[in-house]
C-alpha cells in the first residue's frame, strides 16, 4: 500500500457516521435474536438468518454466511451465543476479501495508463453524476489532470449538473447539444484529453433501463468509439448503485452486468439508511469489487472502499 492509503481520523469518523444506521439496526436485531441464549442453536441461527436477509445482505449471501457459522461452531466448538458477533465479523470480512481485489490506495490510477479512462454507468437518480464530480475532485486533489465527458445527452439536467461540477472542481467538461450521439461526446472528450496530456477521463452515460438491448448497444458503441482514440479504453467501467434502495440495487447490478462488462462498483447514499448490508451481498453475488462508497453529501464524503475499515466500523464496539 502506498503513502496515500493512510486512513485518517476524519475518514474514520465519516465512515462510522455514514454506517451508523446500518450498525444500529443490524446489531439491535442481532442482540434481540440472541437475547437470553447460552449457545448457538438452530433458533439462534434462524433468527440471525432473518436479520441478515432483512438487512439487505441478500438470501444467497446470507445462506453462505450461516453455513460457514454452522461449520465454525462445530469445528471450533464456539457454542456461546456471545461469540456470534466475532464469528459473524470474521466471515463477513472473509467474504469481502474473497470477492474484492486488494484495496486500492486513495484516488490513484496506474501511472502507465494515461489517460486512465473510466466509463461510469448506472440508472438515473443513484448519484452517478455526483459521484463523477466527487471523483474528479479527489483525482485533482491527488495532483492529476482530469477531463469530464457529458455523454448522458438525453437529460439536460445531467449535462448541466456535470458542468456545475466541472466549474466547482475546476476541470474541463466536454459536451455537445442535447440529443447528440453519446459516442461522439466520448470521442471528443478523449481526443481533447489526449491532446492536453490529461491523466484521467470520466465519461458520464445515460441511465435508461427500459430497453436492455438499447442500453447494451449504446454502451458498446461508446466503448468502440473510445478505442479509436485510446486503444485500451475504457480502463474501467464503474457501476454506481444507490445503497439506500436495498434489494433494488441487486436488480440494477444484474441489468448492467448483463449489458456491459462492469469492472468496479461505487455504492452511494449509505448514510441515512440501514441498508448498508447491500455492500456485502452485491460484492458476493456479482464478484465485482466495490471500489468506492458514498457516505454523505459533502465533497469529501466519497471514500475508497477499504474492507477492514468497513467491517471494523460495522462491528466496532460489538465484537
Regions found by a protein language model. Give the residues of each.
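Intrinsically disordered, compositionally biased charged tails
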Residues: 5-8, 196
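P-loop NTPase catalytic nucleotide-binding module
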Residues: 6-7, 313-319
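Short glycine-rich anion-binding loops that position phosphate/pyrophosphate groups of nucleotides
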Residues: 206-208
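Conserved catalytic-core segment of NTP-binding enzymes
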Residues: 161, 181-196, 211-316
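Short hydrophobic/aromatic residue motifs in ordered secondary structure
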Residues: 59-61, 155, 271, 299
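Primarily NTPase-proximal linker/entry elements flanking Walker-type ATP/GTP-binding cores
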Residues: 16, 20-151, 158-178, 186-194, ...
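Switch/coupling subdomain of P-loop NTPase systems
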Residues: 2, 9-15, 20
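Short beta-alpha junctions and helix-cap segments that line functional grooves
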Residues: 3, 104-106, 135, 251-253, ...
Amino acid at each position: 500500500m502506498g503513502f496515500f492509503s493512510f486512513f485518517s481520523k476524519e475518514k474514520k469518523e465519516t465512515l462510522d457516521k455514514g454506517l451508523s444506521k446500518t450498525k444500529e439496526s443490524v446489531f439491535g436485531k442481532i442482540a434481540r435474536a440472541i437475547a437470553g441464549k447460552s449457545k448457538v442453536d438452530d433458533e439462534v441461527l434462524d433468527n440471525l438468518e432473518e436479520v441478515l436477509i432483512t438487512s439487505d445482505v441478500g438470501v444467497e449471501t446470507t445462506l453462505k454466511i450461516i453455513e460457514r457459522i454452522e461449520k465454525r461452531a462445530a469445528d471450533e466448538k464456539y457454542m456461546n451465543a456471545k461469540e456470534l458477533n466475532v464469528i459473524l465479523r470474521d466471515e463477513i470480512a472473509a467474504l469481502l476479501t474473497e470477492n474484492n481485489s486488494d484495496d486500492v490506495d486513495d484516488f490513484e490510477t496506474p501511472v502507465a495508463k494515461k489517460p486512465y479512462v473510466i466509463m461510469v454507468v448506472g440508472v438515473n437518480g443513484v448519484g452517478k453524476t455526483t459521484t463523477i464530480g466527487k471523483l474528479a475532485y479527489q483525482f485533482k486533489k491527488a495532483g492529476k489532470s482530469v477531463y469530464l465527458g457529458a455523454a448522458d445527452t438525453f437529460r439536460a439536467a445531467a449535462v448541466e449538473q456535470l458542468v456545475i461540477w466541472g466549474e466547482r472542481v475546476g476541470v474541463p467538461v466536454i459536451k455537445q447539444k442535447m440529443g447528440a450521439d453519446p459516442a461522439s461526446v466520448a470521442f471528443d472528450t478523449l481526443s481533447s484529453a489526449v491532446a492536453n496530456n490529461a491523466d484521467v477521463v470520466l465519461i458520464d452515460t445515460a441511465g435508461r433501463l427500459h430497453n436492455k438491448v438499447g442500453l447494451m448497444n449504446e454502451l458498446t458503441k461508446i466503448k468502440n468509439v473510445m478505442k479509436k482514440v485510446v486503444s485500451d479504453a475504457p480502463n474501467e467501467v464503474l457501476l454506481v448503485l444507490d445503497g439506500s434502495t436495498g434489494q433494488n440495487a441487486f436488480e440494477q447490478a444484474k441489468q448492467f452486468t448483463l449489458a456491459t462488462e462492469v469492472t468496479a462498483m461505487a455504492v452511494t447514499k449509505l448514510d441515512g439508511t440501514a441498508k448498508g448490508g447491500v455492500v456485502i451481498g452485491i460484492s458476493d453475488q456479482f464478484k465485482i469489487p466495490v471500489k468506492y462508497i458514498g457516505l454523505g453529501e459533502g465533497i469529501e464524503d466519497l471514500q475508497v472502499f477499504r474492507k477492514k475499515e468497513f467491517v471494523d466500523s460495522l462491528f466496532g464496539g460489538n465484537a
